[in-house]
Each structure stands twice: as structure tokens, then as C-alpha cells.
Amino acid sequence: YKFKTSNCTGTVTFGAAGYVAKDKEMPVTLDIFAAEKDFTGVMKVTLPGENGKGIAYQSAVKCKAGEKEKIVLNVPQLGNPSAICFEIMDSFGVTELSEDVSFSDAKNRNGAFSEQAENLIGVLSGQSKELSYLNSLKIGEESDEESVKVVCYSKNSFPQTEEEFQGLDGMIIDSFDTKSLSGKQKSALKSWLKSGGKLLIAGGGQQIDSFEGLEKTFGIIQEDVVVSELYLADADNTVQELPILM
């Protein structure tokens, strides 16, 4: 949802692009703009705990006048996810914004929470509508099926930090020119893959556009089989190999 204080404006998004995966950490993303003066404070998310006591998580917020900042705080899903309190406080502890966020609250349906699913799959594609059939998929045994929800990204909305990938079970890059992604976005994707994220590169005849922009950053080596390797060199020159389906 959108917010406005005496000095700041911005948006707060709960989940991956507004979608929440069950039983996974939930990224809370604050996009903030400070208008007339610098803002220093904290963003705070309070979840319901035992005996009616809330459990709070917070992250520092620093934003210079006339600039925008993005802060991502990952929180576990505890108790009733429909009862979440979001706050922004300044450096003196004065509350600038306090909102109780609810799944059922009409004003949050298209912003804070759009939908819950057992599995969230991110899609970055030039033809995302053609992949909408993935939303009807069920995975697992018939007696224990889990739903799949596709989270569509554009060049502008694609994550810029590893934390923003939290909650996603995988990412599909399909028929998309990855050369248009920023260095921040590529670095975030790289970090997420190193921490266990899964990436599928597709696109048929346009597959070259999908991996060409990642080739230099990641060292993708396309082989004659459908699986390639991603070689990531750490600071100590040790090499980590990660499979990427292509």
C-alpha cells in the first residue's frame, strides 16, 4: 500500500511482489522517498506471538532528502498472518506511520497481500501471458497437492537485493533480453543462486537473449545438453558449480 508522512512518501509491499508463500519467510519491502530533509529511523514489523504478545522485527532506514531508498526486511510467518502491524519511527522513537495490515482488508488486496500459495515461481519474460497456465498447476501426490502461483516481473520490478527473492521456490527467465538488467539485479540474482535459489532459462529460439546478458557476470557455459553449469568464483578463488536448466 501507499503511505505519506510529514516528510516521506512511498509504498510497502508484503511478500514477493505482493504474493506470500505459506510457511516461508516473508520479505517486507519499503520503498521510501524523503522530500524536504533527510530521514533516519527504523521500519518495524510486529507479528502475533503467544499470550497476545507481539514479536517485533526491525531494520534501519536512512534516506537523504530528494532521494529514494529501498529496504527489505525478511520476517517469519507466525500465528495468524492476517494480523500484522507495520510501523515507521524516526531516530527519536516517534511513530511516523502505524498500520495494521490484513489479508481481508479491501485496501490491501491489491497491494499488501494479493494471494497465498504453497509455491511461488518468479517469471521474467517478454511473453509472460503465455506462461499463465502455470497458475493452474498442482504438484505433489494427488492426496497432498500443492498450488503454484506465478509472480511476474518486469525489468523495473525485478529484485535488486537477495532478500527480495525470499519466498520464491524458483525463477524462470524466458524470452527476455537479460542485457537490460542492471548490475544490482544481476548481483542479487547471483547471490540468491549461491544461497540455493533455482533458475530456469527458457525461450526456444530466443533463448540466446535470455542467457547472453548473464554469460559474462555468471560465466554460463552452454553445452550440447539441456543442463549448463554456473561457475562462481569466491574471494578466495574457490569455484562453486551450480546447475542451470536451459
Give the location of each predicted region.
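Short, solvent-exposed loop/linker segments at the N-terminal edge
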Residues: 18-24
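A glycine-rich, often tryptophan-bearing local segment used as a flexible ligand/cofactor-contacting loop or short
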Residues: 160-163, 173-246
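Intrinsically disordered, low-complexity Pro/Gly/Ser/Thr-rich segments with frequent PxxP/GP/PP motifs
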Residues: 49-81
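Short acidic, flexible loop segments centered on an aromatic residue
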Residues: 37-52
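Short edge beta-strand/loop segments characteristic of extracellular beta-sandwich folds
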Residues: 27-33
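Aromatic-Pro/Gly-enriched surface loop or interdomain linker
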Residues: 24, 79-170, 174, 205
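Proline/serine/threonine-rich low-complexity linkers at boundaries of modular beta-sandwich domains
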Residues: 1-9
